[in-house]
Every structure is written in C-alpha cells, then in structure tokens.
Amino acid sequence: TINNELEEWINQSKPISNLPVIQEWDTFTIPYTSGTTGKPKGVLVPYRSRILQLFGMAVEYGCYSPDDRFLAIAPMCHGAGMIFALAPIFFGGYAEIMDQFDPEEIVTALKKEHITGFFGVPTHFHGILSLENAILEKNKPASLETIISNAAALPQAIKEEIVKVFGDNVLHETYGSTEGGIISNLRPADQLRKLQCVGQPFPCTYIKVINESGDECNPNEVGEIFSSSPYLFNGYWKRPKETEEALDQGWLTVGDLAKRDDEGYLYIVDRKKDMVISGGINI
C-alpha cells in the first residue's frame, strides 16, 4: 500500500540538474534505410517531425488517449514498430510490448488485456489468421477499435479476412517511409471498396505524382510520388548528395511509383529500384 512513507521519500529526493536542452530540429533517432541504392543510409529524424506525427496519428486513427490500451507486436528496430508503440505512452495511455511474435498469445492478449488497438505488417496478420477458427472465436476482442497495417502491401484476401474476423470498422492500411513518416491512409470504410489502395493523404500532408516530363500526372497515370508534410526527415547522415536527390524544395521522394484515381486515392505500383520485403522490413 501507498502511505506517508512515499511522501517522505519524495521530499528527501533532490531535483535532477543538468537536463539536456532539446530543440525541435534536433535529431530524435537515426534509423537506417534498406539500402536499395547502395549502402544503408542513416535517416536523421528530428523531434519536431515525430511529435507532430504522433498528433496526426491521434487524429487519423482515433486510438490514442489516456483510456486506450495498445498491443505492440512489431519489433522496436522497425521504424513503424517503434512509433506505434510510443504513441499510446505519449498520450498517457497503455502499451504492452510483446517479447516475441506468437499469434495465439497475441489474440489472447487482445481479449484479456482489453486492447483497443494494434499495429502489424502483413506477415503478422497472416500468422494470426492462420490460427484455428475456434481459437479466434474464443479470443474475440470486445474492446478492439483500431488495427493498422503498414510496411508492405496487404493482400486483398488477408484484408477481407481481417474484416470478417475483427469487423468492418477497424482496419487502416497506411503507406509511408522512414524519411517521410506516414504519407497516406486507407480508412475502414474504403477497405473493400478500393482494392490494392493506400488511401488519401495523411493529415497535414500534400501528395503529388510526377511523370518523366516533370509534370503532375493525370488520373490513373503512373509517376513518381512526392510528399510534403511536417513529418519529413532532416536528411541522410553524412550523405549530402543523397539528401539533395531525395529532397526538392520541401518535397520528398523515396523512389516509389504510384497513380491516383479520379477520387484522388493513391495506389503504389512499383519502385524505381526493386527491393525485397520480408516481415515488413525492406532488404
């Protein structure tokens, strides 16, 4: 029990001195890209972009508040895995970090811990949905409000199964990059209406698709995707040439090819340079 001893212990403590002074453009973290154009590059992510990204996530996903409980199943070495685990804590909520990926343990925790949201990559969802129907039915989560998929395209068959098992009002499919943060999101209402689509611009994000002539593409014309938002990185660590190639007057490209339909929804088509994605991690 908590009694007067706690107050006495606090009163005897000394204030912490010499705390570091953090400026908004200081580097928060340096994750590394997959290195599809050569050696992996360190991405200088400032505090400003990540904090603003957290507020954007709260607006878009609606699952971050002091009352929310998030299950972190992705590794912390993954940029999205880390930010989706930090978000609930930032807003005063709860995050339970799984020490390994075990589909049955995850669905058990979803129900037992009254989890309201979790983030995963397609490999996670494939594992969860491979469980026996009896296990899924037994552990049907009553509190779950938000599921977020990211890091690789979510196959339509898996998407339909997620909707069938967890409901038609919880799934978001998000597109983004280490350098640009979250760029677009396909909301629950559009999951079965827009096939192989990554949605519309994330809050405070502008998107344009540019053809080889340097002009904006017409609807359904494939081009290179550029994004501009408060969530961009500061550049590549000690790689000024690559930074200059990626950033152009506040617009970022990471070499993804895409198209937009007549309603402005975004579809990722290919990459300028090929890569292998395993478990949501670019190789």
Residue ranges and their predicted role:
Residues 151, 176, 199, 256, ...:
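Active-site glycine-centered loops adjacent to acidic/histidine catalytic or metal-binding residues
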